[in-house]
Amino acid sequence: MKEFIRMLGELKYMIPVLRYQWPQADENASLSHSFQESTNKFGERPFVYFEEETWTYSEANKAANSFARYLSSNGVKHGDKVVLFMENRPYYAISLLALNKIGAIGVLINTSLTGDPLIHCINSSNSVKCIVGAERAQPLQEVLEDINISNKDDFLWVEDTNEYALPEWAINLKANLDFDDNENLDQTNKVTAKDVACYIFTSGTTGVPKAAILPNAKLVAAATNITMAGYRINHEDCMYNCLPLYHSTGLMLGLCAAINVGAASFIKRKFSASSFWQEANEFNTTAFVYIGELCRYLINKDPSEAELNNPIVSMVGNGLRPDVWDTFKERFDIDRIIEIYGASEGNALFMNLFNKNKTIGMTSAEVALLEYDVAEDEILKNDEGFCKKITNHDPGLLIVEIGPNAVFNGYTDKEASEKKILRDVFKVGDAWFNTGDLIKTVDVGFAFGKEHYQFVDRVGDTFRWRSENVSTNEVGEILNGYKDVNMANVYGVKVPGCEGRAGMAAFSLEDFEGFNWLEFSEYVENNLPKYARPIFIRIIQEMDTTGTFKLKKNELRDDAFNISKVEDKVFCLKPSSNIYELLDGNWLDKINSEEAGY
């Protein structure tokens, strides 16, 4: 009864979301319009806290106006692309707002990129200028001869700390700005919902990074719904945002959401678990935009005084795994965890509107879960050649129907966009976006009949062993439950003479010499079915992740258990044993000669 009464209270937040209409194509709905509206209402309230700086909405708007005028007077037009290569700081937000005010497109580059990937992202965007933070000038300088921007006037350098000097190939942007420009630009009145606000690049884990197209309508709609039904914040709140603004989580779920209601943002260059709670208290951050790995880092820290009675009430993000969820919510006394699911280039948003546990929530889009053969990496079809839907709670490939209410903007690369579309799925002529993710339905109790879902794994990350499907995420959750394991990365590796892939896990240890392999082996045996137990364990020094803390698997998968190639210690389960032991050259030779008995 208590849950039923609570759910009735959720209706007042759910109904506006269900009734929400996306902005019309020619409507003046954009990031810059939202920002100017919040500036008009809350101009003297804080916009951004950063290190020793505090910017009000009014101050940031003046700087953005001046920057926009500078760009316009130097040839940047509506629809032009401009690279933004800078770490999280106020000038990142100001730069993006300035571009949006004149209808230009921000090309948001991952700040960890160097060399060929950096060259690819810049050249594929056909940008006319590059805004570069002083802190990222060195990797840009190293590729200057290989990119398609060459004039000194086209490199706008934004100073950072005193340790960086202005390079001879760029101009000092701030020296050309008027920080008292109160007049909004006329060009902003021509910026509409259909105009592209920015390009956000994929992580490149399945090839070279691809630029996902984000129109203003998507930014505005996401920010509106997330603040209205997710965070439930207003202009008096402050959001903790340490996620990179070049990524959709930090940008759309973080900065854009705060702008939508005139809230403040505490932004950081990088996440720090050791200073998190002290900063949350200092800036009274009532909201937190997260990804799951950050939450895992926080619960792995010893309890502190700073975490007690912390100000965080609601958090919105993605990737919080079930094995972390309950512990995090209870230990830090968080009222609302609103898990989100949706790709930058995708056409659907799942949201845990009802604040249920361990779910990505529901969606208003038309979706289906398809039967999928993990071993053959293919969608199963019926005798008529159409796809087959999952009819129970088993994982299936999530697809989203493409239509007027679920537009697929895709990538700038049309060929790459087409590869993400499935056609003639259930009938001739239909079209669906292929998420590439395995999802399952879950029972969350009373939810007004709304189906709820849970993320399982990426297609390609799930592997097959002993005629069973093995989810890397689910195995990783179990391994992470062992007290001494630091964030296990699970993947499948080929074993000579065996069908499918054997499980392998990589993780670091605080105390390698003191690690109890017998106890750990018993834990694995008691908590995982035999087919899901990792055959190989690689002990690494530090986990390699993307800029948004996604675990990198490709290199680990390629290295496999080849101890002649890697310096790390590798342990294994032999077919006749349940105890992990050190893999040596003799046993490796037996594996490679198909004599090990796997």
What are these regions (language model features)?
Residues 220-238, 246-286, 301:
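Conserved AMP-binding/adenylation subdomain of ANL enzymes
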Residues 115-116, 144-166, 260-264, 268-408, ...:
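Conserved adenylate-forming
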Residues 528-551, 567-595:
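AMP-binding/adenylate-forming catalytic domain of the ANL superfamily
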Residues 113-116, 120, 130-132, 342, ...:
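AMP-binding/adenylate-forming catalytic core of the ANL superfamily
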Residues 44, 157, 178-201, 208, ...:
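Conserved pre-ATP/AMP-binding loop-to-beta segment of ANL
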Residues 1, 6, 73-74, 97, ...:
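Structural core segment of the AMP-binding/adenylate-forming
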Residues 23-28, 44-89, 93-97, 114-119, ...:
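Conserved AMP-binding/adenylate-forming core of the ANL superfamily
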